[in-house]
Structure formats: structure tokens, C-alpha cells
């Protein structure tokens, strides 16, 4: 078979069409004694069902049995005796069932004289069914699938337009379920999935034209969705059996009926029924029960001939065991009698397990061929094929040329390499078909070229050999710096494919081994190089279908190449390629590829997005711990792979565009290449900036150290906290809350004690750049600014002086005591602002540190355009540290804008008059009490939401809602006594609270919907963010009402 693929006379270039490759009839190979026969069948392939066919070479001695045997052998069929061979004339209803003993050449000469070869269709069909055939076929999957496709085709051609709408809908939905059995039961509810089925696949493949024409599109869609849900849980085999169950009452596909007469004249007109259950029986009327004539094991001989009258009818005689005389049947023509004889003979051979025919007829020249050549064992076949070429002239079992995939099979003669020029080396990997070895190619241009050699373990099988060479014949068409280059092939057994050697191996292993040495720019560079290779494939109309880090090879530290083209396909004139079977990489595949086995450049884009994610994750596989069957469910629920650590947001945004559910919304590879180029350049610029900043920082640290090993008691600069600190320094309780978080960025000790670094461990200074320090340590930088004491210490250190150990110890102890005193004072003064100031967005801290505050400098409680609350009174300065708090305020850094746990007076220390909430009597203030109640409800929900199961979300949100309703009712009672000019602003604040509650409920529903997925935590965070917004806006409402009250008091105050 492989030889046929490699023969340029039998194959076409990638731009030609498979449909015009061969006619329905035959062709002769130039200079050969063989002829070529195209046989249509129902073995599934990726082409349209109407083009499923095999091309078979045959000699003059080949009989029909040999043709059937060769086709079914390639599909590993068990019930070979069930198959028959039909010849149909395409321009008339003329049909001939060819007996297995008939010679193919004689048949062709006989019938092709009557009509041109292209008007005849040779077809392999299942004709002879055993009793309980469905149960037997379930153990022979190729036969079951073949029979299903055959029956479905007959149904669509013959009766589909006449059946009830309900039956047509069920049968069509069962075919959808069988074809796309991995698709979830509710997949057709998605508009994009239904549109793929409707526009790309075509509804006419599943439903009759009468149904599609008579029902409106919107109604039809609803009917299909409703019907499909009935079969949502069926697998492929169950769908097939259910199809037969629904179809059998309206279409008897398990028997054949012939209108004829019993006897030698038209005395009794009957309908003769022949099938596995009835045997041979007849019906006189449609409504009556069949009358049994004989079983197949009772038939001893079969004869047929022309009648002697002028009508030249066909006569069929069956000798039945125990019957006094033969059973005679008169058929309308000799052809029908001959077809009936073939059917009964096939059943007799099947029931008796015989190969010898039961038909007795006079021998006519050319009518019967020599007996079939017995089937040889594999070793005997191999021995025969190693002889001279002339043996092929008498070998009736020549190769089959399946039309599937022939579009990527040009000649390999230019790439053939002599085996003696290859030195096979050590094994460096394992492929789908065999091992991959390192070797040397002794070529004239390069006497010692290092190469990779793919070997094939089981290439004695023609089908395996073809699939193995498929990759080479695909690769030979590519020439790109980031695609592995084909050097040559050896097509004689053992078959080898010789490719360029990428010395650093596959990308996934490379990323895992060098996880800590590869920088972000290198990872983005790899993604960019792959995008250029895939843009090249897209331009040549190829789909790769297996884009993953394991299939990318590393040529050097700055060069990767796309390899493994075993699944690649040329798309011809079609916009997509459909895979019919075989193992596919589910966790990398696009949803339409999983659901419909539909592969396009857009599905390659999805896979490339997953491959980029693998690269940024240093070789981690996607959807770890998730079963293949569960992947599509998660994707359809909106789940996507999370953002990798240190991944630029622009790059992750590009990945998510690649993972758009609708293929039409994904970018093309040309766009991806351009955007990745931009991201790469940006990362290089940032990398250079970080290196310059790091150099300056190292220089500063080196200058500050002054040759001393002493660590400073506190960070020396507000924007650049030194990683060094004293062993006696302990962070405040605010910092202790997030110990785990800080261990990443500068608190590796188990008790939060900072590690010694600086000049002692210079390598640690570059672990985090300035941006990362700000992200990881906002509170630390804003909290610990140098006091006068620290400045003195730094001055001493700068002059090269070292404090005595006992003075250093005293200073550290005193400093720790002062910090504890500061903390107690701050906690006391915290009560100055009401309600609880810890309710700022981002400051309602949970232990997991999920929330970050806004990035602006405005305090979160204060509405835009409103003054800040008054600052608390300043603490009297300690001796030796005057103005400590004012210094802290005056040198506040941008890091304070994170506002994560930072107290409000640190953000806005200046005093503002009049304070909106501080100087009012709250003794009977119902609005204030209800705002406080709402805030408490939010705090309670925030503390309970993390461990709570989804069913407890509703009661917690309900408590918040009740608190809000009470607050709004109180505000409604308060509004009439306030100035009319303030009503509008209060109503707007109320509407904002209602909107906040709606957002909270929406996020709660999402958190419940995506429970047990990786998105659950994300939606919990969004739920808490919405609750925090509600609390903050409630405080804003209180501020608005307080200002209205102050305005009212100002109007009533005597001048």
C-alpha cells in the first residue's frame, strides 16, 4: 500500500482534489499488467461519506472474494462472510450482486461493454446477516459501524422524507450523539456549537430535506435541542443500537423482499422475503403474516436460468431437504433471479460455515474465475514480497490505496537516502511508532552531519508504514527556521525518517530542568518563534493538530523548532479537517475539536495558547488531575487555565483571546506573531531597566555598608527598603497576619525575622525588582520610615564607626519596646473614626490576603469631591525622636496607595474642617446605627465565606440584604427633614447601594455555579469585593447625610 502512495502516477499534489483523483471506474498504471478498481464502502474516514472508498489493484486472476478479503483485512473485520459486492449503474436502477467466485476482469469486460466505466459503481456492503446479528456485531466494532453507516445511508436516500417528524428528529439527534459522543448533553444550548453544526457540518447530514424545509429555523433549533437532551447520556454503541430500535418498525433493514411468483407460471403472485429470522418465506398481502418456505440449512442446491417463454423471465430453483420436488420461483428478469440466488447462497454459506457455493450452473467461458488463492500467513506474504517485481503481476492481494489523506503524499524519491550513509547511535527518545536515535549522516556536503533518526517497529504492516511515512511526506513541504527540517527517508524495511538533530531535546523537559535559569524574555521568545512557524503553516493551509511543549524541540538556548507532524493535515479547498478516529490530545484541544473532531487554524490557535501557558509554567501540563472526559465540561462552564506566575498581563490577555469559545473570535497567527513581537520587545526593555536599577541598588547597598557587617535597625529609604535588618527586629502584628506572603519577598524566617543579605549575600538582592517589591511589601515600605534615631545610626555607619555590642543590644531592646507602645497607642486612637475604619476596600483583611486596595491616593471611604475625615490628634513626641509621626506622614511613599491595612490618617494626615462624621451627636442617630449594622453584616460574611459551602452563601447574603433594607428605610424616614437641595445626592447614594447589592447577588450565583472548579476562589474574591463596595458606599451615604445635616444646622444657626 505504501508503494502505491509513493508512486507519483497514482497520487496528486496537495492542491488537487481527492474527488477527481480517480473516476468511479478504473485506470491502468503505465507499463503495468494490473488494473485499478475503485470500491466504495462504509468504513468511516475523514472524508465525506459519499467518497469513502479504497483503490485496489487487481490482476486477471483476481476474483470478487479476493477484493472483499483485502478490504476487510485492512479494517480487522471478524464477520467476513457477511459482506457482499454490488455493482450499480448510476444512470438507471440496474443492480447486479456479484458472486464471490466471479472473476473481476471478466465482470468488468462484461458490464463495461454495455456502459462506460465511469457510469458503474462498485460497492462493498453487508448483505448476509446472522441470527441475533446486532449482539454479534457489538463484538465486531468495524462491522457494527459499517452496518450502521450502510443502514443510515439507505434510510436517508429511500424513506427519510416519508417518516414522521418525531422519528426523523430522534434519528438525526442519535446520529449527532454518535458522531460527537464526547460532546456534553447541553453543548447544543451554546449558540456557537449549534452554528458549527448548522453551518459548518450541515444539518442535512442528520435530518431529511423535508424536515429542514418545513420547520422554521428557530423552531427547528429548539426541537433539536430538546430531542438531543433525551440522548445526552448515550455512548456511541448505545446510540447505534437506539437508532436501529427506532428505525426497525418503519424500515426493515434486516431482510430483502422480491416481487415474484411461486411456480413456473404467474399463478400465485407473492412477495418473497429473505432474512436471518424468517429464512425463506413469502407474503401474499401486506397485512398477513409471512408463510415459511424453508430454512437456509435445508437448502441443498440453487439453480437459476432464463425461462423458455417469450418474456425471458428468470427462473430460480431451490432443492430443499425433505421436499418431494424443487421450490420454483419465477422472477421478473434473469438479473433479479441471479441476485436472489446470490442472496440465498450467501446465507447458506454463512449458516453452514462453508466457503463452497451452493449454486449449480453450466460453466461458460469467462464467467467463473480460477479458485481464490488461499490466504497466506504474514511471514509467507513477506517472503513473497521480497522477490522480484514480476511477482506483483500474479499477486492478487495488492495494496489498497485509501483516498483518505492522499493529499499529503508526494513522491519521496528525491529524499531517499542510502542506509549505508547513516550511522545509528544511541536512543534519545521514544515516538508513536518506535524509538528515536541520534546518528550521523555521511553526506557529500557534510561528512559528519549529526541527525535524529525515527525508526518504525512494526513497519511490516502496510497501514503502519503509511502512517509512519505520513509525517515525512508532510515535513518535506516545509522550509522554515523554526520548523524541524526533513533530511531524508529510507522507505525499505526497516523504514527510517532522518531529520535535523535538536541537541537540547524537547522543550517541556528543557523548561523543567532550567526552570530557575530561564528569564521571562527567553520564554516569550520561544512563544514568538513558535508563532512564526505556525503563521507559516497557516499560510500553507496546514493544520498541525498537536501543538504542545512536548512536540517542540530546542535547537539552542535561543532557538526552538516545531516538530512532530504526525497529526498534521492539509486542508485542501475545505476550511477544516475532520478526524474520524485515533488518539488525540484532549487537554490541549479546542472545544469544537473535542465536540466535533473539527480542526482548523482557529483550533491550532487555541492549542498554541495552551502551549504558551505550558511555556510560562515551565513545562507544567494543563488541567493537571482532571480527567479527559471532564475537560470539555469545564471549558464550556467558562473555566480557563489560570494566569501563570510572573506572566505579563498583556501576554495572559493574549492567551485568553486564543481561548475564545467561538473560533471566529480567536486571533489569526499573523496577529499573534505581531503582538508577541511587541510583548517581547517590551519585556526586553523592562529587563534592561531592571538590570540598570539593580546595578544602582547594588552600588547603593555597597556604599551604605561602609565595610561593616552591621545590619541597620530599619530600612534606610522609603522607596527602596534594604533587604538587610537586625536580628532583633520583629514586624508588627499587622505584618504578622501575612507572614506567609512576606516569606516570598523578604521574610523567610518562621517567626517573620528578616534574613541577612546585602553585601553578605549579594545574589539575593536581585530576586525581586522594584515593582515586585512594591507589589509584595506595600505596608512594610510605608510603615517603617527612618526616625532621627535611625538617621544617627546611619551616620555613624557611614563614617565607618561600629557601635559596641552592648549599646547595640540596648538600642534594639528599646526600639522593640517603643514599637509595642506605638502599636497600643494606634489601636487606642483607631476608635476615633466611626464606623470601624477597617472596612476600607482592601483593608477588611482575611488571612489569605486575597484583596488588594485601589491604586489611587484618595482614601477609599471618601466619595469623590468630598473632604477627608479629620485626622486623630498627634502623639506627643518621645525624647530623642521628635516629630516621628509627622515625619512619617510627610515622606509617605506611593506604596501607601495600596491602602491594604494602612490606617487612613497615614494617607491624608492634614486636618480638614469641618469633619463630616466626628462632631455629631450619635446618641439617637438611626442612620448611623444601621450603617454600622450593615458594616457588621459585611464583616461577618467576610469572615465566614471562605470555609462555607455554597448552600450557606444565600443566608449570609440575605443578612446583608436585610441590613441594607433597614438602612434604606431609615434614610427614607430621614430625608423629609433634610434640605431639599440634598435630596438628589442622597437618592443617588441609595441607588448605588441597590446596585451594589445586585452585584453581590450576581457574584454569589457565579460562586455557586463554579463550585469545585478552579474559578471558585476567583468568584469568592469577586463576591467579597462586591460586599466591601457595599460597605464603603454605605459609609459614603452616611457622609452625604451628615453633610446635609451640617448644612441644615448652618442654615438654622443665627448670624
Curated annotation (Swiss-Prot):
Pfam families: FERM_C_FAK1, FERM_M, FERM_N_2, Focal_AT, PK_Tyr_Ser-Thr
Catalytic activity as recorded in UniProt: L-tyrosyl-[protein] + ATP = O-phospho-L-tyrosyl-[protein] + ADP + H(+)
Superkingdom of the source species: Eukaryota
Location in chain, cross-link Glycyl lysine isopeptide (Lys-Gly) (interchain with G-Cter in SUMO): 152
Residue numbers carrying Phosphothreonine: 13, 917
Principal EC category: transferase
Keywords for the protein's UniProt record, in alphabetical order: Acetylation, Angiogenesis, ATP-binding, Cell junction, Cell membrane, Cell projection, Cytoplasm, Cytoskeleton, Developmental protein, Isopeptide bond, Kinase, Membrane, Nucleotide-binding, Nucleus, Phosphoprotein, Transferase, Tyrosine-protein kinase, Ubl conjugation
Bias (Basic and acidic residues): 685-697, 837-849
PROSITE patterns hit by this protein: FERM_2, FERM_3, PROTEIN_KINASE_ATP, PROTEIN_KINASE_DOM, PROTEIN_KINASE_TYR
Residue span of region Interaction with ARHGEF28: 915-1055
Description of activity control: Subject to autoinhibition, mediated by interactions between the FERM domain and the kinase domain. Activated by autophosphorylation at Tyr-397. This promotes interaction with SRC and phosphorylation at Tyr-576 and Tyr-577 in the kinase activation loop by SRC. Phosphorylation at Tyr-397, Tyr-576 and Tyr-577 is required for maximal kinase activity.
Biased segments, Pro residues type: 869-880
EC number(s) stated in the UniProt entry for this protein: 2.7.10.2
Subunit structure: Interacts with GIT1. Component of a complex that contains at least FER, CTTN and PTK2/FAK1. Interacts with BMX. Interacts with STEAP4. Interacts with ZFYVE21. Interacts with ESR1. Interacts with PIK3R1 or PIK3R2. Interacts with FGR, FLT4 and RET. Interacts with EPHA2 in resting cells; activation of EPHA2 recruits PTPN11, leading to dephosphorylation of PTK2/FAK1 and dissociation of the complex. Interacts with EPHA1 (kinase activity-dependent). Interacts with P53/TP53. Interacts (via first Pro-rich region) with CAS family members (via SH3 domain), including BCAR1, BCAR3, and CASS4.
Function description: Non-receptor protein-tyrosine kinase that plays an essential role in regulating cell migration, adhesion, spreading, reorganization of the actin cytoskeleton, formation and disassembly of focal adhesions and cell protrusions, cell cycle progression, cell proliferation and apoptosis. Required for early embryonic development and placenta development. Required for embryonic angiogenesis, normal cardiomyocyte migration and proliferation, and normal heart development.
UniProt note: domains: The first Pro-rich domain interacts with the SH3 domain of CAS family members, such as BCAR1 and NEDD9. The C-terminal region is the site of focal adhesion targeting (FAT) sequence which mediates the localization of FAK1 to focal adhesions.
Protein's UniProt name: Focal adhesion kinase 1
Native source species: Rattus norvegicus
Upper taxonomic lineage: Eukaryota, Metazoa, Chordata, Craniata, Vertebrata
Gene designation per UniProt: Ptk2
